[in-house]
């Protein structure tokens, strides 16, 4: 699978992801970019799960952002509704972590839109490791959001066999 982590701290929000794509137990590619900017660079998003499914979801989410003039929560709820009710979309297997200057959200195929505690998101196979590392760093250091996300990904990459050390990182200024 993968690891995606999002951290919000001191006026910055970051989403970072590794680059490993696997097919079964074989590494197919090591430099996949699973994090990208959407909606005129005002939203950042990362995915965990099937690559083709995730790109479909990115496209659908960007359409929802355009329909709702960039309102992250409304776009996320509308995507989750469609994802839950549309037969074709229900077959897509991916999770999205999305953020703008105000909010960080997880969007799931079950129709869930979750705003996590402490604006910390970690999804994918290495998510629990990245979340534990990022939480410890948030609570015990003065490190910035980008440094925390990078270190959390490094730790997840050392532990999770489906996570590598090729990182893609996107960052936005944050009001939250």
Swiss-Prot record:
A Pfam family the protein falls into: Proteasome
Coiled-coil ranges per UniProt: none
Catalytic activities: ATP-dependent cleavage of peptide bonds with broad specificity
GO molecular function: metal ion binding; threonine-type endopeptidase activity
Active site location: 2
Catalytic EC class: hydrolase
Family as reported in the entry's similarity comment: Belongs to the peptidase T1B family. HslV subfamily.
Compartment(s) where it occurs, according to its Swiss-Prot or TrEMBL record: Cytoplasm
Cystine crosslinks: none
GO BP terms in the entry: proteolysis involved in protein catabolic process
Subunit and partners: A double ring-shaped homohexamer of HslV is capped on each side by a ring-shaped HslU homohexamer. The assembly of the HslU/HslV complex is dependent on binding of ATP.
Entry protein name: ATP-dependent protease subunit HslV
Transmembrane regions: none
Chain positions recorded as Na(+) binding sites: 157, 160, 163
UniProt function note: Protease subunit of a proteasome-like degradation complex believed to be a general protein degrading machinery.
GO terms for cellular component: HslUV protease complex; proteasome core complex
């Amino acid at each position: 699978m993968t690891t995606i982590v999002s951290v919000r701290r001191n006026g910055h929000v970051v989403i970072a992801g590794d680059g490993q794509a696997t097919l079964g137990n074989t590494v197919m590619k090591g430099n996949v970019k699973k994090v990208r900017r959407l909606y005129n660079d005002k939203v950042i998003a990362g995915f965990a799960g099937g690559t083709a499914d995730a790109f479909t979801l990115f496209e659908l989410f960007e359409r929802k952002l355009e329909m709702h003039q960039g309102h992250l929560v409304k776009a996320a709820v509308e995507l989750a509704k469609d994802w839950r009710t549309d037969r074709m979309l229900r077959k897509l297997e991916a999770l999205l972590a999305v953020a703008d200057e105000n909010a960080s959200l997880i969007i799931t195929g079950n129709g869930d839109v979750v705003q996590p505690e402490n604006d910390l998101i970690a999804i994918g196979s290495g998510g629990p490791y990245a979340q534990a590392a990022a939480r410890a760093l948030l609570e015990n250091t003065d490190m910035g959001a980008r440094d925390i996300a990078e270190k959390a990904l490094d730790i997840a990459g050392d532990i999770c066999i489906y996570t590598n050390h090729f990182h893609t990182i996107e960052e936005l200024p944050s009001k939250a």
